[in-house]
Regions:
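N-terminal glycine-rich phosphate-binding loop and ensuing alpha1 helix
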Residues: 1-129, 133, 138-146, 387, ...
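Left-handed beta-helix
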Residues: 2-7, 28, 35-58, 137-138, ...
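Stable alpha-helical structural segments in soluble proteins, enriched in small hydrophobic residues
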Residues: 46, 113, 556-564, 674, ...
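Conserved core of the sugar-phosphate nucleotidyltransferase
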Residues: 64-66, 85-86, 92-228
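Short beta-strand segments
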Residues: 71-74, 131-134, 156-159, 212, ...
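Short helix/loop capping segments that flank catalytic or ligand/cofactor-binding pockets
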Residues: 80-82, 140-142, 164-166, 192-194, ...
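DPxDG-like acidic metal-binding loop motif
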Residues: 87, 91, 715-737
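C-terminal nucleotide
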Residues: 444-697, 746-757, 764-898, 908-950
């Protein structure tokens, strides 16, 4: 997906280097210097330039349809936000959100904007290939997107207060057809909106438009001077937009004929970054969005919530009086006195003594190889108007008064005086000391004679010239130097900083890039989750340094996770008592599970800090529960373990043999760990015994356990976890432990930690509890999911029953290596992984809703969406052998997925109807991919785990 950016001219030559992106995926240009094209003309210019750069030999109509593109308009003079004019507002650094995990310390507006636009375009139907958006807004949506209709123009809007809508474009729809645009208005009055409200609904335009190839060609045609190929001023919103809809305000036959769909952005939030005020107010609004202290991870309390400091060294104490303060890429020394309503950017390391008045901002811009420009300004300045007009303000006073206060005459100002933006009033110097004197004279000390002399002597440039000639590489180098120091401080001050909530994959790369020493191992009194993050970060840094000990560090992180989960349970010790007659057998059996939405969100550590949501169903195979366990007493005081399916047997005579359960692939790891948890090992027993034999003697018999897993390994149906639950359930009954089904599931999670296989809770809950259910857990080390049963109509009704197909692919893949990879990403707060997991949690709620409504088609489509999400999380989910099977039958399905971690095992398919199901059966039976592949009859289990006695 290509990104096309319209940027300030000075930025386009170094954008790729500064942002470390490639030229293929990112295309940059700027509007022709001196010409105003508007958003419509600018779109035409941007697309034409990209077409010429990548495929000049191909016709435009062919080229536009080949690929999806995101266009961001981010040029302009930035008069009302001078501090980020030179580098473009779209690259404005944005502070880490106090309540969010997985963000990068170096994030900017562009990196925050893009994920939503990519989500939209990934969901857009074929033919809708071009998304257009503005570069000075941040739009958030945490909810799943609705389906995007196949219209020529699709626009997103927000439900807002009418007073806010008067400052923006507004989509107006008839109340009877809310999804269809009736007409569009630009900045309507409150009276206008009130008059419309009886018959119409209105949404505020948030500037996200998707255009079909046809709509793009019409837009481009309107952007050209009639009869020429010259681009003229044409606005996407006020010209093109007003001609859209069923009753458009502007008549234009070709545009009028375009179909339009209006979509409210689900859970949408709109933050504007167009002015100095908005830089602070929008950032404050984002930070203030979450007040629940349980979601705010750091323990620092700022003296004022509207203080934002990033990429900077500050050596002054701040108080509640320093409201609306923004410091970025700057050194603020001990001798500075700050007020409120101030933006300080670009200030190099200095020894200045300066008293900055309220509302006064400082921007220092590197220019050339070693010079700086001093640009102080007022927070309310708009950099507009002739210098001799009383309405033209600079540093919050009329410009003429600023001149008078400093004894400057008109002869002292060379060049243009008709527009403050173009006036050469900002001095250029090489000395940082002189820079400080100039700033003092220009802001708070107008009588400072030395400052006046320096100003008169210096070459001076305008705001326009600053943007055109700023040395952005030097600006970024300074920012990186400050950020390097910030990394050290954040790591050292981890208890009160955002350090361990950051994207630690990015942090590891930065530590290596800046050649920083590794963070120390945290002390044992640190919070368990912080200690886990710390060890995994250290492991990642060591891996980047090709240090062979990185595996040990990684294992330390996993061990801390196990200790955390075991810590909660280790207090629950057991005293097993023989609870059967000498000739009785306890028989446990369980179904397996298919997860249809939210799988992976149940996996620690993600579920521990975010909670999980999963929809899954318990199924029997070929009419019976496939996992079975038999427990009976034996006369000898030892433990005999047998596996029918593996043809294996082992006799255990001591604690050492019993606790040797960490070998992956061992046929008896599960029963050994289960017996340990049941109190047959010192760590989990209420009593102390000198030996296992002595404990069994006190117990009253030896134990014989026989396992039968009538299902292949690596099936993806939660076999190992549910088998563990079945063993625990049978032992629970045999030993009179009085555990309920929730206890059994909790112990299963601990058992998997003992085995070092990891894993979440959805497998055991899916098999132990019957039917189809929504499972939800809260954050915390003690994971006790709430079980909500969903109706089984879609699985048992004759219209749908035969549409659920289960096919064994004959391909296997062990989940442990997949788990370790994804869990490492969770430990490291990988931003893309966390975003996807949050989407998967929300998707589980959509799936639950579809089942509650008995909407079969929606259910099937959502299963397909789950499969797409699983592949995004792990690229090995759909190997070529599996993809080849799917290719044969996909046209007959509403959705399909490999249950569990994927990569092999069983393929679950939702056929469009019983006839399609018949076709799928025929195709895969006739064209089986290997001798083991076969259909298996699946039925919904109405019992879950069952335990009975002979």
């Amino acid at each position: 997906m290509q990104k096309l950016l319209s940027l300030p001219p000075n930025l386009i030559h170094c954008f790729h280097e500064l942002e470390e992106v490639n030229h293929t995926d990112w295309f940059c240009t700027s509007d022709p210097i001196g010409s105003k094209l508007g958003s419509g003309g600018g779109t035409t210019w941007l697309l034409q330039a990209c077409h010429q750069a990548f495929a000049p030999q191909e016709s435009f109509s062919n080229w536009i349809g080949h690929e999806k593109r995101i266009l961001l308009h981010a040029g302009g003079q930035s008069r009302r936000l001078p501090s980020y004019g030179p580098s473009g507002k779209i690259l404005t650094p944005i502070p880490i959100f106090s309540w969010e995990r997985g963000q990068k310390l170096g994030q900017n507006l562009l990196s925050l904007q893009l994920p939503l636009y990519e989500r939209i375009m990934n969901q857009a139907p074929a033919g809708l290939n071009t998304l257009i958006a503005s570069g000075d807004v941040y739009i958030r949506s945490e909810k799943p997107l609705q389906d995007i209709p196949n219209a020529d123009v699709v626009c997103y809007g927000l439900w807002v207060n009418p007073s806010l809508a008067t400052h923006h474009g507004v989509f107006v729809s008839d109340r009877k057809k809310p999804e269809v645009l009736d007409f569009m208005l630009q900045k309507p009055s409150l009276e206008e909106l009130e008059g419309l409200s009886k018959t119409h609904l209105f949404l505020m335009d948030i500037g996200i438009w998707i255009l079909s190839d046809r709509a793009i060609e019409v837009l481009m045609k309107r952007s050209l001077k009639e009869g020429t190929k010259d681009i003229t001023y044409y606005d996407l919103y006020s010209d093109y937009g007003l001609a859209l809809g069923e009753h458009p305000k502007t008549k234009d036959e070709e545009i009028n004929q375009l179909s339009v769909a209006i979509l409210p952005l689900p859970g949408g939030e709109f933050y504007h970054y167009g002015t100095s005020h908005e830089l602070i107010s929008s950032t404050l609004a984002i930070q203030d969005k979450v007040r629940d202290q349980r979601r705010i991870m750091h323990r620092k309390v700022k003296p004022n919530p509207a203080i934002f400091i990033q990429n900077s060294i500050t050596q002054v104490s701040l108080s509640a009086d320093n409201a609306n303060l923004w410091i970025e890429n700057s050194h603020v020394g001990k001798e500075w006195k700050l007020g409120s309503r101030q933006i300080i950017t670009g200030v190099p390391e200095n020894q200045w003594s300066i008293n900055l008045p309220d509302g006064v901002c400082i921007d220092i811009i590197p220019i050339g190889e070693n010079e700086f420009v001093a640009r102080p300004y007022g927070l309310d300045d708009v950099f507009k108007g002739a210098l001799d007009k009383i309405t033209t303000t600079y540093l919050n006073v009329p410009f003429t008064r600023w001149m008078e206060d400093r004894g400057i005459t008109w002869e002292d100002i060379k060049g243009r005086t008709d527009d403050l933006q173009s006036a050469s009033i900002f001095p250029k110097v090489a000395s940082v000391e002189d820079l400080g004197i100039l700033v003092r004279w220009m802001t708070s000390e107008p009588q400072l004679e030395e400052g006046k002399k320096l100003w008169l002597k210096a070459e001076k440039v305008s705001a326009d010239e600053i943007s055109a000639n700023a040395n952005l590489k030097r600006l970024y180098e300074q920012r990186n130097a400050f950020r390097k120091e910030n990394w050290k401080g954040l790591a050292a001050n981890y208890e009160k900083s955002v350090f361990y909530q950051l994207n630690l994959l990015d942090a590891a790369n930065e530590f290596v890039r800046f050649n920083l020493g590794m963070p120390d191992v945290l002390k044992e009194d640190a919070a368990p989750m912080l200690r886990i993050h710390n060890r995994m970060l250290r492991a990642r840094i060591m891996k980047l340094h090709e240090d062979k000990d990185c595996a040990k560090e990684e294992q330390a992180a996993f061990q801390l996770l196990r200790d955390g989960l075991l810590g909660v349970m280790s207090e629950r010790k057991s005293h097993p008592i023989l609870n059967v007659y000498s000739d009785q057998i306890v028989w446990g059996r369980s179904p397996v599970r298919i997860d249809v939405a939210g799988g992976w969100t149940d996996t620690p550590p993600y579920s521990l800090y975010s909670g999980g949501s999963v929809v899954n169903l318990a199924i029997e195979l070929n009419g019976q529960p496939p996992l079975q366990v038999y427990v009976k007493p034996c006369k000898e005081y030892h433990i005999t373990l047998r596996s029918i399916d593996m043809g294996a047997m082992e006799v255990i005579r001591n604690y050492e043999e019993l606790q040797d359960y960490k070998k992956v692939g061992s046929p008896f790891s599960i029963p050994k760990a289960a017996l340990t948890l049941a109190g047959f090992a010192p760590a989990f027993s209420t009593e102390s015994y000198p030996s296992l034999a002595k404990q069994l003697e006190d117990f009253g018999s030896g134990i014989e356990i026989t396992l039968l897993a009538a299902i292949p390994a690596g099936s993806g149906l939660g076999t190992s976890s549910i088998l563990a639950s079945t063993v625990l359930g049978a032992i629970n009954d045999f030993c009179g432990l009085a555990w309920d089904k929730n206890d059994i599931c909790s112990y299963t999670l601990v058992l998997e930690q003992l085995l070092t296989t990891g894993g979440g809770w959805q497998d055991q809950y899916g098999g132990v509890f019957s039917g189809i259910k929504l499972l939800q857990s809260e954050a915390g080390f003690e994971q006790n999911p709430l079980v909500r049963w969903l109706p089984d109509q879609l699985f048992v009704h004759p219209d749908y029953r035969d549409c659920h197909l289960l096919y064994y692919t004959g391909i296997t893949r062990t989940a442990k290596s997949i788990l370790a990879e994804i869990v490492s990403s969770m430990f490291l707060n990988s931003g893309p992984h966390l975003s996807l997991l949050a989407e998967m949690k929300a998707h589980a709620m959509d799936m639950s809703e579809a089942i509650l409504r008995s909407n079969f088609e929606s259910f099937g489509r959502l299963v397909g969406k789950t499969w797409i999400q699983n592949q995004a999380l792990d690229c090995g989910t759909n190997p070529p052998a599996v993809a080849a099977i799917i290719e044969k039958i996909k046209d007959y399905t509403l959705g399909y997925k490999l249950p569990g971690a994927g990569g092999g095992g069983y393929l679950y398919m939702v056929a469009k109807d019983p006839q399609a199901a018949g076709q799928i059966r025929r195709i895969l039976t006739e064209q089986a991919p290997n001798p083991r592949a076969r259909f298996v009859e699946m039925t919904l289990s109405d019992k879950g785990l069952q335990v009975s006695r002979s």
